[in-house]
Amino acid sequence: MNKMEYLSIFGFVSVLYLIIRVDARAYEVNGIDQSKVGFDDNYVVTWGQNNVLKLNQGKEVQLSLDHSSGSGFESKNHYESGFFQIRIKVPPKDTSGVVTAFYLTSKGNTHDEVDFEFLGNKEGKLAVQTNVFTNGKGNREQKLALWFDPSKDFHTYAILWNPYQIVLYVDNIPVRVFKNTTSQGMNYPSKPMQVVVSLWNGENWATDGGKSKINWSLAPFKANFQGFNNSGCFTNAEKNACGSSAYWWNTGSYSKLSDSEQKAYTNVRQKYMNYDYCSDKVRFHVPPSECKWNN
């Protein structure tokens, strides 16, 4: 075994170790068997009805994108805090221009939003882009190359949103943290948001800056989803109740990453993140104010 092979194997084992060691608190306390929660319990199809297929008695949903339409669904409820997760298997092979999205969003021009977006690619790994909008302002993109092929099998993607922080997880590993720094004069998502999932045509920007278009001869493109339970505080709850520590995701242990989560997060940033708006000196001569708190 040469040195490069050894380092490659060592790096892979290190990632596995961190995945095993990372504190999966958010997955343990929920206590609900995901396999028993059906699509219709929490979600409704919102567009592209002809491109939505319910499988396994509603325990799995397949979205399709063809030349006529993409498709999507959203949660029946609006939330003001919570832990939201879903299992996704994205379309395989050449998916240039195809976007698979899982996100939280409010409505209107001054909306809040927290995004997972899988940006299609030619043969090979696709990029995962995350973004955070506050009062209609985004431009907070980060991109990473996952340590697995998300088209081969289902993986779990989750968003923790509480009064302290927003954390995006991939298979229990934190891949993004956005802290509540309103005390420092910054904005933080606070509007009631729905969970939205979609498969759509993003060829004008998603791959190579829009240079690589969708190869429609490969359509339809199909993405599959499982695990439709949400742990969230409904908007119609008593005023200010959604920030209460009576909800497990608002307790002090979720006010910051655990030590093991922090180690895993640092590993992701060092090895897998290939774009961070906070480091983009072309777009931002001075890093946005929130960067010093979130990095």
Swiss-Prot record:
InterPro entries, sorted: Beta-glucanase/XTH, Beta_glucanase, ConA-like_dom_sf, GH16, XET_C, XTH
Residues carrying sugar: N180, N215, N229
Lineage, uppermost ranks: Eukaryota, Viridiplantae, Streptophyta, Embryophyta, Tracheophyta
Cited PANTHER family: XYLOGLUCAN ENDOTRANSGLUCOSYLASE/HYDROLASE PROTEIN 8-RELATED
Keyword Cytoplasm tagged: no
Localisation per UniProt entry: Secreted, Cell wall; Secreted, Extracellular space, Apoplast
Entry-linked Pfam families: Glyco_hydro_16, XET_C
Gene Ontology biological process terms in this record: cell wall biogenesis; cell wall organization; xyloglucan metabolic process
Signal peptide start-end: 1-24
Coiled coil, from the record: none
Disulfide bonds: C233-C242, C278-C291
Residues the record lists as binding xyloglucan: E117, Q129, T130, N131, N139, R140, E141, N204, W205, G209, R283
EC number in record: 2.4.1.207
GO molecular function, one term: hydrolase activity, hydrolyzing O-glycosyl compounds
Active site: E113, E117
Gene3D superfamilies membership: 2.60.120.200
Catalyzed chemical reaction(s): breaks a beta-(1->4) bond in the backbone of a xyloglucan and transfers the xyloglucanyl segment on to O-4 of the non-reducing terminal glucose residue of an acceptor, which can be a xyloglucan or an oligosaccharide of xyloglucan
GO cellular component: apoplast
UniProtKB keywords: Apoplast, Cell wall, Cell wall biogenesis/degradation, Disulfide bond, Glycoprotein, Glycosidase, Hydrolase, Secreted, Signal, Transferase
Listed name of the protein: Putative xyloglucan endotransglucosylase/hydrolase protein 1
Keyword match Cell wall biogenesis/degradation: yes
Organism of origin: Arabidopsis thaliana
Record site: Important for catalytic activity: D115
